[in-house]
Amino acid sequence: MHINIPRSLIALAFAVLTAPTLADECAPVKSAMLNSGHTPHTVILTQTDGQGKKTVTRQVQTVDNKYVQTADGKWYAMNIAIKDLDDDLSGVLTCRRSGSDSVSGEATVVYEVHVNLQGQVSDQKLWVSSKNMVLKSEGTIEGSNYTTEYDFAHVTPPANAKPMGGK
């Protein structure tokens, strides 16, 4: 007995059966993003513009404050506690596990992530550790390439930070 099933029906069944699997690729990414965001950390952000000019800035997030170093080297306290950070990750649209790598000697899983956060659309790569932390990210936004490196072991707020707004 031969059953003739239209290819479109097979494709539809495949899409329905694999959609939950594809959607679950974002679960570990979102979990690591939230976990990393709610853990004190230091960030080194390197921006490379379309002409190849690099700008390196730093951020320190403690339990009760966020410190940002501007391109001129000055530090500012932003009065943003970890509990005040936005947990809305609905803009993380698609995620795909693309391999494994290491960051600073720590094994990671690499994900390719398509994001639309507050109108900023980007494609990023995230390196997620077995401790459920984002250790590195790379992406392009409006023609500039960004590399962000996270450090959860060395979190010391700058002594010379001025309150944002000059108060």
Indicate where each model-derived feature is located:
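N-terminal leader/targeting segments and the immediate start of mature chains
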Residues: 1-52, 103-107, 159-167
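A short glycine-rich beta-turn/N-cap micro-motif
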Residues: 39, 63-65, 131-136
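Hydrophobic alpha-helical segments, especially N-terminal targeting/anchoring helices
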Residues: 69, 101, 128-129
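A short, amphipathic edge element
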Residues: 87-100, 149
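Gly/Pro-enriched, hydrophobic low-complexity segments
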Residues: 107-166
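An acidic-aromatic
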Residues: 44-90, 145-147
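Extended lipid/amphipathic-ligand handling interfaces
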Residues: 31-32, 58-60, 150-152, 156
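Short, ordered beta-strand-loop transition motifs
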Residues: 61-63, 98-109
